[in-house]
Amino acid sequence: MGLKNKIIKIYELNEEERKKVLEFLKKEILNGKIVICGTDTLYGISANALNEKAVRKVYNIKRREFNKPLSICVRDKNEIEKYAYVNDLAKKIIDKFLPGPLTIILKKKPGIPDIVAKDYIGIRIPDEPIIRELSIVPLTTTSANISGKESPTTVDEIDKEVLKKVDYVIDIGKCKYSKPSTIIKIEDDKIISIREGVIPIQKLARC
C-alpha cells in the first residue's frame, strides 16, 4: 500500500464514511495490523495489546528495547479494572482526570502479556473520540517515533521510516494538547510522579 493510500483524514469524512472506516480498522486491529492514530496529546502507534506478535512489531518499528514497558489505551473507565487493580486513590484520580492527558500506572492483573508490561501497567483514556472508538481491545499507546526522537503532534512530523512500517495512519489534524501526558504511579496510597506533562503534578496531589 502506498503512503498516500494508508493515510486516512478521518475528520474530512462524513459520518457514514467515518463509521465504515472505523469498523474496518477495528477488524484490522483484531487481525494484528498496526495503526498510527492521533490522541489528545501526541500521535501514537497502536496495536492489539493482547496480541504478542503485534506488540513485538510495535517495538521493532520504534526500535525500542523490549525491557521498556508500553502503556495501553482503553475505551472507558470500566475497562481499567479488567487489566489493573484500582484502589480508592486511583479511583478518585480516574474519576476526576480521565478521559484526559494522564497516564496512570497501576498494578497489573493477569491478561495483558508480559511483553507489554510486567508488574505494573500504564493506562490511558485519551480525550479524543477516534482512538477510544478503536479501542475494542486494549491498544498499545506509545509515541509514533523512533525511540529517543521527537514525538509527533501532526502526521507531517512522523518519521517516514515509521510511516512506511505501519499499516494505517489516522490523521486527526494537530493533537489537542500537543505535549506528552502526565505520568503517575499509584503505590498503596501514594502518588509517585514519573513525568509532568499537560496536567500539573500538584493538581493530582490534591486528590
From Swiss-Prot:
Full protein name: Putative threonylcarbamoyl-AMP synthase
This enzyme's EC code(s): 2.7.7.87
InterPro entries per record: DHBP_synth_RibB-like_a/b_dom, Sua5-like_dom, TC-AMP_synthase_SUA5
Family the UniProt entry places it in: Belongs to the SUA5 family.
One CC-aspect GO term: cytoplasm
UniProt entry keywords in alphabetical sequence: ATP-binding, Cytoplasm, Nucleotide-binding, Nucleotidyltransferase, Transferase, tRNA processing
Positions of the YrdC-like domain: 15-199
Superkingdom, natural source: Archaea
Subcellular location: Cytoplasm
GO molecular function, one term: nucleotidyltransferase activity
Reactions listed under catalytic activity: L-threonine + hydrogencarbonate + ATP = L-threonylcarbamoyladenylate + diphosphate + H2O
Signal peptide (from-to): none
Function, as annotated: Required for the formation of a threonylcarbamoyl group on adenosine at position 37 (t(6)A37) in tRNAs that read codons beginning with adenine. Catalyzes the conversion of L-threonine, HCO(3)(-)/CO(2) and ATP to give threonylcarbamoyl-AMP (TC-AMP) as the acyladenylate intermediate, with the release of diphosphate.
Any one GO biological process: regulation of translational fidelity
Enzyme class: transferase
